[in-house]
């Protein structure tokens, strides 16, 4: 699970790998990677998503929410700026209402932007844990 979602290293930015979802299915002792989601833009897109194929009864699904972000600072091309507003556009960290409504049982969402793992079902978020305490990835 962790090795799949860690394709987004959690450092934010505009690279494609940081602006798409990764995930898969846990079936017994197997972890099956789902096709990565399409690249999104946190300034323009409401969300990004991943599609898990062939979900069976008893499967556990997991996916990431991207760390990508766009930071817009005031333009200082003409000289010194006093005041101004910096805007940050980023992806939602916690499971969305859609994630919760589509839960097939107990599912996992890895928030790559803040390193939190959300454990949730159709009733909502049941627990959170820092990813660094969840499991140590292969090196």
Kindly give the residue locations of the regions a language model identified:
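Glycine-rich short-loop/terminal segments
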Residues: 1-58, 123-124, 129-138
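Active-site-proximal loop/helix of nucleotide/amide-processing enzymes and allied scaffolds
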Residues: 44-139
